[in-house]
């Protein structure tokens, strides 16, 4: 396995980000770390969250010799990113809610942000709105339950559409034309969200922008040369290496199947003392 790209999230939401990165770098090796023992992150004290994430990610970077870390979690990006960058010598990429492109796209200038309560209330989020959407009416919707519904869908294949409609009723009532998906879990249920909200609402997430940033940083660090070499090798021998790591005592059969279908050949539990 060559030096992998390490994608990190509290749960399965980061798979949506990983999928976007793979479109740009299809022959790279990947590690996916999901800290599902502590899901959802939005309910943890900040210092507890920081200590646990730094320990997990730094240990796995050392183990895998990862060349870049992608924090595919909005909560962790706003809380943990500075500590990770202080403890790692490799690039660390975070998630930024797609407020700017949403404001640019909106014709009615009525946009919304659907995220966890933690992301909705953070000062950083309000700074983004002030900086990039001051000409828009912006509605904020915080909902942790949608995170668990996305996890449940991956685990069982089932989605309670009646409950989803109830949760999204305030979004429908707001009469928006663009809704930012401010949690990486939400693209995993994008079809269901679109079904409830209707075709008149455009859903935007940050996956493509993150992938573009990863390519830029690898180029700046001269690591894109290594990626081209790996690409040539992969074209000769086949599929890239994919490893998944989780922290819960066990994961569901449905989630295991999903990871295998995504191309992961190794699915392993790791532990942390934090």
Curated annotation (Swiss-Prot):
Swiss-Prot/TrEMBL keywords: Cell shape, Cell wall biogenesis/degradation, Isomerase, Peptidoglycan synthesis
Annotated pathway: Cell wall biogenesis; peptidoglycan biosynthesis
Top EC category: isomerase
PROSITE patterns: ASP_GLU_RACEMASE_1, ASP_GLU_RACEMASE_2
Active site: 73 (proton donor/acceptor), 183 (proton donor/acceptor)
Cystine pairs: none
Source domain of life: Bacteria
Enzyme Commission number(s): 5.1.1.3
Any GO BP annotation: cell wall organization
Catalytic activity from the UniProt record: L-glutamate = D-glutamate
Binding site for substrate: 9-10, 41-42, 74-75, 184-185
Family matches, as SUPFAM superfamilies: Aspartate/glutamate racemase (SSF53681)
One Gene Ontology MF term: glutamate racemase activity
Similarity section: Belongs to the aspartate/glutamate racemases family.
Name the UniProt record assigns to this protein: Glutamate racemase
Species assigned in the record: Shewanella baltica (strain OS185)
Gene it is expressed from: murI
């Amino acid at each position: 396995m060559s030096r992998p790209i390490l994608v990190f999230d509290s749960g399965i939401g980061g798979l949506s980000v990983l999928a976007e990165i793979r479109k740009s770098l299809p022959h790279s090796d990947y590690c996916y770390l999901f800290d599902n023992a502590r899901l959802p992150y939005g309910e943890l004290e900040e210092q507890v969250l920081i200590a646990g994430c730094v320990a997990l990610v730094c240990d796995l970077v050392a183990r895998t010799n990862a060349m870049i870390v992608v924090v595919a979690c909005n909560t962790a990006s706003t809380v943990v990113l500075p500590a990770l960058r202080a403890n790692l010598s490799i690039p660390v990429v975070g998630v930024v809610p797609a407020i700017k492109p949403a404001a640019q796209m909106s014709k009615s200038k009525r946009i919304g942000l659907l995220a966890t309560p933690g992301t909705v209330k953070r000062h950083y989020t309000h700074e983004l709105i002030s900086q990039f959407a001051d000409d828009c009416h912006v509605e904020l919707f915080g909902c942790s339950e949608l995170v668990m519904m996305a996890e449940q869908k991956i685990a069982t294949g089932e989605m309670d559409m009646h409950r989803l409609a109830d949760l999204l009723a305030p979004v429908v009532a707001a009469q928006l034309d663009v809704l930012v998906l401010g949690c990486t879990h939400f693209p995993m249920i994008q079809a269901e969200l679109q079904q409830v909200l209707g075709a008149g609402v455009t859903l935007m997430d940050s996956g493509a922008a993150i992938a573009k940033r990863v390519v830029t940083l690898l180029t700046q660090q001269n690591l894109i040369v290594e990626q081209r070499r790996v690409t040539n090798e992969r074209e000769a021998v086949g599929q890239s290496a994919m490893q998944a790591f989780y922290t819960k005592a066990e994961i569901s059969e449905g989630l295991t199947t999903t990871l295998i279908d995504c191309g992961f050949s190794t699915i392993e539990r790791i532990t942390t003392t934090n």
